């Protein structure tokens, strides 16, 4: 499926994740599509919590701030950082870079199950 294709393209490198923008990920303008971007962040956050706490999550809110464009064949680096957590929820800050230039910043609120 579409989600599986995106999940398979993510590569873990230390505390970061990398992905190469492929042709199926771009929109008609030639940049990465917003839906693909949201799915990438969802997959990264799910992996972070699966590895750290071995718990499932439900994404409550995803606030995406685009600061640049990511074109075809760009290698994006995603740095997730947990900035707050409680017994039932958490907040994750994800920064996306391409060659040390910030492309996007995403705040994700999750509910822990």
Tell where the protein language model's regions lie, with residue ranges.
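Hydrophobic beta-strand-centered segment that forms part of the acyl-chain substrate-binding groove
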Residues: 29, 45-76, 82
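Residue-level recognition of well-ordered beta-strand positions that form the cores
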Residues: 18-20, 63-65, 79-81, 95, ...
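A general structural signal for short secondary-structure boundary/capping elements
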Residues: 6-8, 52, 61-67, 107-113
